Amino acid sequence: QALARRVNSDLANGIGNLLSRTLTMIERNCSGSIPTVPTDYLDSEAARAKYPLLVHVKESLRTLEDCLDESYESLAFNNLLLHITSRVSDVDTFIDKHEPWKLAKDPDKRDELEIVLYTAAECLRILGLYVYPVMPSTAKNLAEQLGISLDFNSPLLRQKITWGSLPG
């Protein structure tokens, strides 16, 4: 039980730090509004080559669903929290690699900056849906901070996990 509390605390701190970091950059660079990016921004081979970590993060979040299903079925909540914590770390790595604070200084990199910030916010939205069953107040706070409305009681929750559903 002590391990579960520790993992839960680490996850809440990780999500909170990621949320704060993301929202601060959006506030500074996008007038506080989540940027809008084309839904097909990863469809070209060139885009996938330019953003390999984005592709990794997106795939990592997609596979999280299967990991969580196994954890819920076996009541292995520590594993569930560890899987989610790993994805939070992936998003942090993505941000660090793309250095949006540097992109913001170059007007020619505006599109790239918006893709990075949108991706971070979209990852947070999806992570919020995944943590809701074990950390409902964290998930609700995350949605509120992102300025989005989520119906956590919907039986169609998985349909909302589709990448690119974050309104910009």
Where are the language model's segments positioned?
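Basic, alpha-helical terminal appendages of large translation-related enzymes
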Residues: 66, 70, 75, 85-168
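Long, charged, mostly alpha-helical binding arms that flank functional sites
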Residues: 1-112
